[in-house]
Amino acid sequence: MTARRILVTSALPYANGQIHIGHLVEYIQTDIWVRFQRMMGNEVYYVGADDTHGTPVMLRAEKEGITPKALIDRVWTEHKRDFDSFLVSFDNYYSTDAEENRELCEKIYLALKAEDLIAEREVEQFYDPVKNMFLPDRFIKGECPKCGAKDQYGDSCEVCGTTYVPTDLKNPYSVVSGATPVRKSSAHYFFKLSDPRCESFLREWVADLAQPEAANKMQEWLGAEGEASTLSDWDISRDAPYFGFEIPGAPGKYFYVWLDAPIGYYASFKNLAQQRGIDFDAWVGPHSTAEQYHFIGKDILYFHTLFWPAMLRFSGYRTPTNVFAHGFLTVDGAKMSKSRGTFITAQSYIDTGMNPEWLRYYFAAKLNASMEDLDLNLDDFIARVNSDLIGKYVNIASRAAGFLVKRFDGKVDEAALAHPLLEQLREAAPQVAHLYESREYSKALRLVMELTDAVNAFVDTEKPWELAKDDGKRAALHAACSVSLEAFRLLTIYLKPVVPNVAAGVERFLNVAPLDWRAIDQQLSAASPVQPYQHLMTRVDAKQVDALLAANRESLQATAAPAAADAAAAIEPIADTITIDDFAKIDLRVAKIVECQKVEGSNKLLQLTLDLGEGRTRNVFSGIQSAYTPEQLVGKLTVVVANLAPRKMKFGVSEGMVLAASAADEKTAPGLYILEPHSGAVPGMRIG
């Protein structure tokens, strides 16, 4: 069979913060798939980079009193360390602030311009007179022009779901300085995504997307065929001061970070190609026969399934073979929380002495090919790792290896290896391979654990520890241990993409060459004696998990001073003082979320049915879809403004407002967080 040629990427982490376990879901998912492809003998390259440009990086560097270059170099070192610690096997880990990326950005931009897909338009924007800079959407807040909700971002209202341009905001203020912005006009450059050529191409391209959820979401964005296009042109420029690449022929104008970030995939691969003598153009040119896959979070699907493929198609490059999106990580059923210690950084996990392969295995045991969210239940984490990896898998080797080494000089009984159990394990190879290929890791590991149970049942039946007591059963002992260790070798092949360090230890102990998928048709040989058994993995101790949570709770206090320095970017100014009489007008009540569902036609709103202890339920729309799934909210208690006048919206009448917290700068502190009363509160209780 001809080897496939595959280019694989994960999304680029932003160079403005630490890697945490939520990030690691994606990199572990990608790495498992890449390692499997390598084991299959395919030519696969896995590339990544830090996403380094944009206003948040520029402002953070300014606050730290260093250059943006110094900041991104430091963060790159930290990110690379974390990926190495979790065995993420990039062939090249690079930076978007690289000459290869500058050249590719300019080349793609000029090609799109030659295709008449770049338009120049005057745009009126808010300008911070204190910082002397134009303000991106997320660096402006004010009152929603439709419902009047305060402290809404410059692009959409999280209360009523309305979208708008920043200049529509009432009483706007700069998140950077707190100043009232002024309006200024500026020439901006747009990628004409609304061009009929782009729409026609995207309708054709979406048909090949593997994930139904992604295809359905794209159909929503594209609208019904035959109707007027719902696609909007994309502003790809930003004004100075800005940390990024200047647009050729446009002094003082810079490529928007979301243009140069995905091009960074190609820049990283080009840098690798130069190192290894790979024909870059043969891999990424329009007639390439290679495959190209992007693993991403579902929150950036829009950029990877609309802008990115259209940019490539009309600038003379091949388009992605597919885009694989995953869901978000929760911990113990809730969003990661610094106060609870569940906002766990990659470095703290390693510093606590936790084994990275424990987390790799647990994530794999929960991951599938869908975009559904994944929950790290810490009690289940301890139980599953200790049961599956230690109690079932590693236990096989520890029960058989000692007898084989001591009694038979480590030499297997080759004649015994024609056992039906081993044939059963080999017959599962195509199914395990199919499940890895299709990213159904949880099903793959479930099947492998079923096979592991069968091997343990064989060991329990043969009882080598009993056979060893009877010299007359020496041959039976030899056969039982030989079959057990050959079965262990086969199971290791199936688990190697997930636990590569354990697999390397097994290869040393079994005295075999590095295991790939072809090794399934081979077997242990008496000519290569098994070596003395060495412990492959220790059990998870609950005290380690407790220490990990404590370390991350402490990190919140330890970083309080740096966080204060970032306050201008992350936390908006305190509102004007009010009297106690003003506050008394607001009736805050505890409410139970009885039902919850997504609002058709909106990617921001959830429709909640709330019980406020009134003998009836209320209908409330809330712009929290980016942070919660309906399943996560049903049954929870929350806090509602109960005496807010009902508001008629596009999707129905909203009879209140659910309270939620967020930072001003979601790059620095991403997320929305609903308020949850402590246990004991009941629907209808007043808060005051």
Swiss-Prot record:
One annotated GO molecular function: ATP binding
Taxonomic superkingdom: Bacteria
Chain residues that bind Zn(2+): C144, C147, C157, C160
Any GO BP: methionyl-tRNA aminoacylation
Predominant location: cytoplasm
Motif ('HIGH' region): 13-23
Cofactor annotation: Zn(2+)
Reaction(s) the record says it catalyses: tRNA(Met) + L-methionine + ATP = L-methionyl-tRNA(Met) + AMP + diphosphate
Cellular component, GO annotation: cytosol
Family: Belongs to the class-I aminoacyl-tRNA synthetase family. MetG type 1 subfamily.
Subunit text: Homodimer.
Name of the protein this chain belongs to: Methionine--tRNA ligase
Native source organism of the sequence: Cupriavidus taiwanensis (strain DSM 17343 / BCRC 17206 / CCUG 44338 / CIP 107171 / LMG 19424 / R1) (Ralstonia taiwanensis (strain LMG 19424))
